[in-house]
From Swiss-Prot:
Crosslink feature (Cysteinyl-selenocysteine (Cys-Sec)) location: 497-498
Lineage: Eukaryota, Metazoa, Chordata, Craniata, Vertebrata
Name of the protein this chain belongs to: Thioredoxin reductase 1, cytoplasmic
Active site: 472
Annotated organism of origin: Sus scrofa (Pig)
Cofactor binding summary note: Binds 1 FAD per subunit.
Residues the record lists as binding FAD: 22-23, 42-43, 58-59, 63-67, 131-132, 161, 200, 334, 341-343, 472
Signal sequence, renumbered to the chain: none
Keywords carried by this UniProt record: Cytoplasm, Disulfide bond, FAD, Flavoprotein, NADP, Oxidoreductase, Phosphoprotein, Redox-active center, Selenocysteine, Ubl conjugation
Length: 499
């Protein structure tokens, strides 16, 4: 057209999202709210054992949701035992039915998968169960499970592919071991189980497996819960050991062999010490690997469009607006470099990104003071800095740690676990004793932590906590009466529920 300005290229979509997990779906639905043409590509590569699942990503299918439900199964077993002391006549032997539990959990997950499909359809988001790979600028190839390929174009792209469990790279690991991707839909009870790893996934799974009555051993290479407050991590480990979970420390598996096939079968694990030549062997019905997760970024054609990744970790560096080094490509969730790997973070980031792209918003995702909970038998809630990080950031002389054990009233009648629940706050003495770290070990830790997380966002100080009247008799009230500092070395042991 003579003299006319060149028209912009017409794309099939305004936004194509690779990954149908919590973050990707949140971004898709939010972008659709602003009448944008949105497509979601989601594809689950089966595990080495062949496990696959529906729309919704890791959290819904193979992490937070089934994990919390199975943790609840274990808590109910403890509640049944406690109930005898409260006058209930409960049979001496309590049996757990694995198949019944997994069927109920999988039925619930199935309803969630269906709900996500319906929500996308209602919001006019195009969904394809296909594997997305960049093939050129603004272009992506979608391959379905039958191998059929289609090419789509979009003005902008969002990578929200998440992570998958890492394997050891030893003989027998992919042939005979399971991961958390397999555990929650395992069609038979795992029996005597070895959990390899010290991640929160490892300890949570070990905890509920032991809680439903299984023989559980955890093999740990170095420390528990790397990245978390180590004082809290060690208390979790001690509590798990006291409740029958065995720990093999400073060993790593070097070979897994099948002794007998079956559901479950029998496996032999050969492991080597991390600091000597010592070799040990053990027999288990199931070996579950929980040694970490790897970002799903290496096989989606990023090199074709020039998106930079950290070659060692596969993580994607982004700006504070989740933009990659390629301006029209964004990324959110667990695949981001140096960001918190949590579902609600991905959801928040996805929503806010869509609002910035399509609604003129300037609000960015705040990755500071993100609360989290580890659902070990004794739950661990945290917000803000670990003690180690606080010392590193402010200097040991500029922090004050207030702490106390506490005994939930409900546990006094069965007379169990006194001086196991623990509360700790870390304060910056140079900033009006502002609370920079909040940590609690006890029942319902997530429920306790959530409200305090809002307070930390508002700049909570020790004085404000002290002037807050507690609710009696609940666990959270301990935070309104903390008076003993770690520095003082004074006793924090409790004689009763009211301190």
């Amino acid at each position: 057209m003579n003299g006319a300005e060149e028209l912009p290229e017409m794309y099939d979509y305004d936004l194509i999202i690779i990954g149908g997990g919590s973050g990707g779906l949140a971004a898709a639905k939010e972008a659709a709210r602003f009448n944008k043409r949105v497509m979601v590509l989601d594809f689950v590569t089966p595990t080495p054992l062949g496990t696959r699942w529906g729309l919704g990503g890791t959290c819904v299918n193979v992490s937070c949701i089934p994990k919390k439900l199975m943790h609840q199964a274990a808590l109910l077993g403890q509640a049944l035992r406690d109930s005898r002391n409260y006058g209930w006549n409960v049979e001496e032997t309590i049996k757990h039915d694995w198949e019944r539990m997994t069927e109920a959990v999988q039925n619930h997950i199935g309803s969630l998968n269906w709900g996500y499909r319906v929500a996308l359809r209602e919001k006019k988001v195009t969904y394809e169960n296909a594997y997305g790979q960049f093939v050129g600028p603004h272009r992506i190839k979608a391959t379905n499970n039958k191998g059929k390929e289609k090419i789509y174009s979009a003005e902008k792209f969002l990578i929200a592919t998440g992570e998958r469990p890492r394997y050891l790279g030893i003989p027998g690991d992919k042939e005979y071991c399971i991961s958390s991707d397999d555990l929650f839909s395992l069609p038979y009870c795992p029996g005597k189980t070895l959990v390899v790893g010290a991640s929160y996934v490892a300890l949570e799974c070990a905890g509920f497996l032991a809680g439903i009555g299984l023989d559980v051993t955890v093999m740990v290479r170095s420390i528990l819960l790397r990245g978390f407050d180590q004082d809290m991590a060690n208390k979790i480990g001690e509590h798990m050991e006291e409740h029958g979970i065995k720990f093999i420390r400073q060993f790593v598996p070097i070979k897994v062999e099948q002794i007998e096939a079956g559901t479950p079968g029998r496996l032999r694990v050969v492991a080597q010490s991390t600091n000597s030549e010592e070799i040990i062997e053990g027999e288990y019905n199931t070996v579950m690997l929980a040694i970490g997760r790897d970002a799903c970024t290496r096989k989606i054609g990023l090199e074709t469009v020039g998106v930079k990744i950290n070659e060692k970790t596969g993580k994607i560096p982004v700006t504070d607006e989740e933009q990659t080094n390629v301006p029209y490509i964004y990324a959110i969730g667990d695949i981001l470099e140096d960001k918190v790997e949590l579902t609600p973070v991905a959801i928040q980031a996805g929503r806010l990104l869509a609002q910035r792209l399509y609604a003129g918003s300037t609000v960015k995702c705040d990755y500071e003071n993100v609360p989290t909970t580890v659902f070990t038998p004794l739950e661990y809630g945290a917000c803000g800095l670990s003690e180690e990080k606080a010392v590193e950031k402010f200097g040991e002389e500029n922090i004050e740690v207030y702490h106390s054990y506490f005994w939930p009233l409900e546990w006094t009648i069965p007379s169990r676990d006194n001086n196991k629940c623990y509360a700790k706050i870390i304060c910056n003495t140079k900033d009006n004793e502002r609370v920079v770290g909040f940590h609690v070990l006890g029942p319902n830790a997530g429920e306790v932590t959530q409200g305090f997380a809002a307070a930390l966002k508002c700049g909570l100080t020790k004085k404000q906590l002290d002037s807050t009247i507690g609710i009696h008799p609940v666990c959270a009230e301990v935070f309104t009466t903390l008076s003993v500092t770690k520095r003082s070395g004074a006793s924090i042991l409790q004689a009763g529920c009211u301190g």
